[in-house]
């Protein structure tokens, strides 16, 4: 039987994106990153009637790709493409430094 070594355990401690599983566990229970908080704050200012805003760094921690979910009355009677354009316009300066952005918009159901 081979001796155990830390190097042998590395494959067991990796997540699906080749990042340590410990990183994913810490991220799952952590609050928002500074960049996520910044984007969230901008969206709160641009969409004051929003009932829900969630910004998630989906790049693995480098801040290059985000998923944004926002629910707001401001989107009422607008097509999805128009809603997404509103979000893009609100974040136009931040988008310059991003690799990608996933946007999910909705209108609150009463």
UniProtKB/Swiss-Prot annotation:
Keywords: Mitochondrion
Protein origin, superkingdom: Eukaryota
InterPro entries per UniProt: BolA, BolA-like_sf, Mt_Fe-S_assembly_factor
Entry's Gene Ontology cellular component terms: mitochondrial matrix; mitochondrion
Keyword Mitochondrion: yes
Keyword Mitochondrion among record annotations: yes
Chief location: mitochondrion
Localisation per UniProt entry: Mitochondrion
SUPFAM superfamilies reported in the protein's UniProt record: BolA-like
Transmembrane feature ranges: none
Family: Belongs to the BolA/IbaG family.
Quaternary state and interactors: Interacts with NFU1.
Function comment: Acts as a mitochondrial iron-sulfur (Fe-S) cluster assembly factor that facilitates (Fe-S) cluster insertion into a subset of mitochondrial proteins. Probably acts together with NFU1.
Name the UniProt record assigns to this protein: BolA-like protein 3
